[in-house]
Amino acid sequence: MRATSSLFALIGLAALGACTQESETGESNYLNLCAGCHGDDGRGAGPAADSLEATPADLTLIAARNGGAFPMVEVMSKIDGYAKGEEHHGAMPAFWPLLEGRTVLVQTGDGILTPTPEPLVELAEYLRSIQRSEAE
């Protein structure tokens, strides 16, 4: 019984460590690839923002602009360049580092699990973690 409890505790700690690592990796990729335009806080006021044709989006209000739900698949499609919306007035930098390496299966909402680059998923998860309401 004691060995079983210890095993479950170790599994729980390993899962917690994986969540922390995912958050750190997503945040690190955000700071390296996105903060220049969107700012360290994601609100659209990065150091390069003034030199751009259009103001970068406030990435902390993605869910608020989507009725409170974070549109994970759409966010990943914007990041990797697959979906280019009318509101985006210029090319985002190449995010090829997010498209390399290991893939994980992501539920895309249509019942299909889609292999997706893990760094892309981690970045989208980080963006989900910084969401706020418009009132904040």
Predicted regions located by residue number:
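Axial heme c-ligation environment in periplasmic c-type cytochrome domains
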Residues: 50, 57, 79-115
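Detector for the c-type heme attachment site
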Residues: 22-23, 37-43, 97, 128
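Sec-exported extracytoplasmic/periplasmic mature domains
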Residues: 35, 80-84, 97, 128-135
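Sequence context surrounding c-type heme c attachment/ligation sites in exported
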Residues: 24-35, 113-118
